Amino acid sequence: MNQPLNRFAGHHPIVLVVDDNPAIRDMVSWALELDGYEPAEATEGSEALAWMANAAREGRYPSVILLDLAMPGMDGQEFLQRLHEQGETTYPSPAIVVITAAASSSKMTGLGVQHIIVKPFHVRDLLDVVRKFTT
């Protein structure tokens, strides 16, 4: 398997998967792990922000966030707004990859989204995008 490089040397790149669908989280996390990444999971935006705060206390930061937009609780757009408000002083800038059924790139560009993947998607295509941001 292709072993991507991490901008935080000595560790596998962390990829935070934020999606309310357990089947998607499981499939994506499994593929990421097989490809040499350390997947972390959250079911919605507030859980993702809590994970990031806890990980930051340990000096751990995701290199990439794979984010669903339509979730119960804090959705993807609100998560992006909160993350953007906290700024780079709180977290190094991870690459934001939105995974959505309805691609609307106009509202995402101002919130730091680097790439949009439209559902349904092939796992190999998702891994190619993740590799692009971690090598």
Predicted regions located by residue number:
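Charged docking surfaces used in two-component/phosphorelay signaling
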Residues: 26-34
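Alpha4 helix (beta4-alpha4-beta5 surface) of REC/receiver domains from two-component response regulators
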Residues: 78, 91-94, 101-118, 124, ...
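Active-site residues of response regulator receiver
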Residues: 68
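Conserved sequence signature across two-component system core domains
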Residues: 18-19, 42, 65, 99-100
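Non-catalytic signal-transmission and effector/linker regions of two-component phosphorelay proteins
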Residues: 1-16, 22, 26, 57-59, ...
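Receiver (REC) domain active-site loop signature in two-component systems and cognate sites
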Residues: 71
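Helix N-cap/capping motif at the beta->alpha junctions
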Residues: 41-54, 76
